[in-house]
């Protein structure tokens, strides 16, 4: 039996007496059998690929970085979500800013962000990265990394748990699913 015949057998209607289930298998031939390929919107395909292979770059500045390392350890296993930490901004599409951002580090954060290829996303992890946190009134602290780079997801906590970071990453995946990449 050839490949097309096997696919045809799988694509035929499983409901008896010739009834057609319009939701699962619409009436008529499938595009795969007619033309040999399946069509989908390019946005859906790109977003599926992007959510399945997010490569974050760690920008650990303080104690939140320890929880970020904990999220990448064996207990939570970010690899099952297709998330692999990358050492270089040119290889990553997500930046996780974890910890207190001081004024001297702000230009370096922006420089690293600018080196990332498009499309790029930022997760702000912890109270200090979100809004200055405990050091909010210090003269040397940036009151939120969103003043330097655009932030897509905020993960609250001091420090946030590794589970909270995983939840934030899953929220970013949902946000990526909803984006429209190609102007239409």
From Swiss-Prot:
UniProt GO MF annotations: 4 iron, 4 sulfur cluster binding; iron ion binding; NADH dehydrogenase (ubiquinone) activity; NADH:ubiquinone reductase (non-electrogenic) activity; quinone binding
Membrane topology: Peripheral membrane protein
Any one GO cellular component localisation term in the record: plasma membrane
Keyword Iron-sulfur: yes
Top EC group: translocase
Catalytic activity of the protein: a quinone + NADH + 5 H(+)(in) = a quinol + NAD(+) + 4 H(+)(out)
Annotated residues for binding of [4Fe-4S] cluster: 63-64, 128, 158
InterPro entries: NADH_UbQ_OxRdtase-like_20kDa, NADH_UQ_OxRdtase_20Kd_su
Its EC number(s): 7.1.1.-
Compartment(s) where it occurs, according to its Swiss-Prot or TrEMBL record: Cell inner membrane
A Pfam cross-reference name: Oxidored_q6
Cofactor: how bound: Binds 1 [4Fe-4S] cluster.
Cited NCBIfam families: nuoB_fam (TIGR01957), PRK06411.1 (NF005012)
SUBUNIT field: NDH-1 is composed of 14 different subunits. Subunits NuoB, C, D, E, F, and G constitute the peripheral sector of the complex.
Family membership noted in the UniProt record: Belongs to the complex I 20 kDa subunit family.
Task performed by this protein: NDH-1 shuttles electrons from NADH, via FMN and iron-sulfur (Fe-S) centers, to quinones in the respiratory chain. The immediate electron acceptor for the enzyme in this species is believed to be ubiquinone. Couples the redox reaction to proton translocation (for every two electrons transferred, four hydrogen ions are translocated across the cytoplasmic membrane), and thus conserves the redox energy in a proton gradient.
Listed name of the protein: NADH-quinone oxidoreductase subunit B
């Amino acid at each position: 039996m050839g490949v097309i015949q096997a696919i045809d057998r799988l694509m035929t209607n499983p409901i008896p007496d010739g009834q057609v289930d319009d939701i699962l298998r619409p009436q008529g031939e499938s595009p795969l059998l007619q033309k040999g390929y399946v069509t989908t919107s390019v946005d859906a395909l790109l977003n599926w690929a992007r959510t399945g292979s997010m490569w974050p770059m760690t920008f650990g500045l303080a104690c939140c970085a320890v929880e970020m390392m904990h999220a990448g350890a064996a207990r939570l296993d970010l690899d099952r979500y297709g998330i692999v930490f990358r050492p270089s901004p040119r290889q990553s599409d997500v930046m996780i800013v974890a910890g207190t951002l001081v004024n001297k580090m702000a230009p370096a954060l922006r420089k690293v962000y600018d080196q990332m290829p498009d499309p790029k996303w930022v997760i702000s992890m912890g109270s200090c990265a979100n809004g200055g946190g405990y050091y909010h009134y210090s003269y040397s602290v940036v009151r939120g990394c969103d003043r330097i780079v655009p932030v897509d997801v905020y993960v609250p906590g001091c420090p946030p748990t590794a589970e909270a970071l995983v939840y934030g990453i899953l929220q970013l995946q949902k946000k990526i699913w909803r984006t429209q990449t190609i102007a239409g």
